[in-house]
Amino acid sequence: MFSVGLTGGIGSGKTTVADLFGKLGATIVDTDLIAHRITAPQGLAMPLIAREFGAEFVAADGSLDRAKMRALVFSDESARKRLEAITHPLIREETEREARTAQGAYVVFVVPLLVESGTWKTRVDRVLVVDCDVETQIARVTARNGFTRAQVEAIVARQASRDARLAAADDVIANDNASVAELAAEVAALHQRYLECAAAARN
């Protein structure tokens, strides 16, 4: 099935754009949502995380203590790799399972770290980047998540640069000051193009 990899930095508006594609009938497979699901109470990753990192990283409800884990992986590169060794295979497995059952004309994979991963670029037919400048990212995330500026800057620094994302893009949606209506119009135009690509891929 024809597939699009949708990516962008934190706070760029990936979820808003993905929701617009979903309303038009595309199948959305969001790796962030899958990551949250496997680290929720009774999530597939939780027994492995508890065994690897200890019970102190499990919240009272049985989910991942995200704040504690975030602090650890930002200060300890080996801890980040140990966490990813647990979560990434499970995310891949769930991602492929959802893609196999897709009912839409094409699939949009929402992958925040698509450019960084190295493998996703060859997994999808087109890469769509939702782009905005770093100051816009910082303003959105501090307002949305309650993070400090320094916390957001640290997250941005660990992600691919804006230039690297744009270099990997087949399509770009600029989302610094776009209204939802403007985004919807851009998504609708891309949707028509992707429908044509999906039809050509089936023939």
UniProtKB/Swiss-Prot annotation:
Pfam family, one: CoaE
The protein's Enzyme Commission number: 2.7.1.24
Gene Ontology MF terms: ATP binding; dephospho-CoA kinase activity
SUPFAM superfamilies in the cross-refs: P-loop containing nucleoside triphosphate hydrolases
InterPro entries, sorted: Depp_CoAkinase, P-loop_NTPase
GO cellular component, one term: cytoplasm
Pathway: Cofactor biosynthesis; coenzyme A biosynthesis; CoA from (R)-pantothenate: step 5/5
Gene3D superfamilies hit by this protein: P-loop containing nucleotide triphosphate hydrolases
Domain DPCK: 3-201
GO BP terms: coenzyme A biosynthetic process
Catalysis: reaction(s): 3'-dephospho-CoA + ATP = ADP + CoA + H(+)
NCBIfam families for the chain: dephospho-CoA kinase
HAMAP family for this protein: Dephospho_CoA_kinase
Record family assignment: Belongs to the CoaE family.
Protein name per UniProt: Dephospho-CoA kinase
Gene for this chain: coaE
